[in-house]
Amino acid sequence: MDNNFKIKDLPKNERPQERLIRYGAEVLSNSELLAVILRTGTKNQNIMMLASSLIKETGGLDQLFNQSIEELTKIKGIGVTKAVQILALSELSKRFKTYKSGNEYKISTPLDVSNLVMEDMKYLKQEKLKILILNTKNIVTYIRDVFIGTLNSSIVHPREIFCEAIKKNGASIIICHNHPSGDPTPSKEDINITLRLKECGKLIGIDLLDHIIIGENKYVSMKEKGTI
């Protein structure tokens, strides 16, 4: 016998799916939208209770969408299937924000870079290095994660960075990485990596425009600091 509470076990006028059909998705709360996707609760919690507690326990949607599958499955009521559903939803959300309707994204200021990558990077538990490849009009043509782990100049090799830019016919690049501590203050290694990549870019003919360090809702631009 299946003891899991399902959406259909709720009164019809309280079912998120029915409310979505009748009133539109925009009127549903975050918990209701998550409930529509997860569909079933547990033997002790209906799906609305589970969705609400999941968002609360992880600290909100931003934090929920940056959990790993291991972290999600440690939460009571979340098995592998539900964890995978959440991760898939998270990735779709990030891709939509990054590639919104296929619109071109032009970089004019460091804030433009921050707006592009902040949601994806601000709560990461490990350091991640992204490369943004730009054309001659400073429009982002490609974004890729090139490294995950503690950054230092002996590990981050210019070859890996500029190889992507050459493949994609990039005119220039911007690199971004996060500090899991939430403090984006550049370390000595951050500065060394930046200067090394700047020099390599000059030799290759692909300019490093900036190195943005992401913290918790704040960032530091190496260009604004005068490092490059």
UniProtKB/Swiss-Prot annotation:
Keywords in alphabetical order, please.
Hydrolase, Metal-binding, Metalloprotease, Protease, Zinc
Query: Which amino acids does the record list as binding Zn(2+)?
Result: 177, 179, 190
Question: The motif JAMM motif: which residues?
Answer: 177-190
The record's SUPFAM superfamilies line, in alphabetical order, gives: JAB1/MPN domain (SSF102712), RuvA domain 2-like (SSF47781)
Molecular function GO labels: metal ion binding; metallopeptidase activity
Q: Where is the MPN domain?
A: 106-228
Report the PROSITE patterns cross-referenced here.
Answer: MPN, UPF0758
Q: Name one GO biological process term.
A: proteolysis
Query: Can the keyword Zinc be found in this entry's annotation?
Result: yes
Alphabetized NCBIfam families for the sequence: PRK00024.1 (NF000642), radc (TIGR00608)
The entry assigns this protein to a family as follows:
Belongs to the UPF0758 family.
Write down what this protein is called: UPF0758 protein CBO3003/CLC_2900
Annotated organism of origin: Clostridium botulinum (strain Hall / ATCC 3502 / NCTC 13319 / Type A)
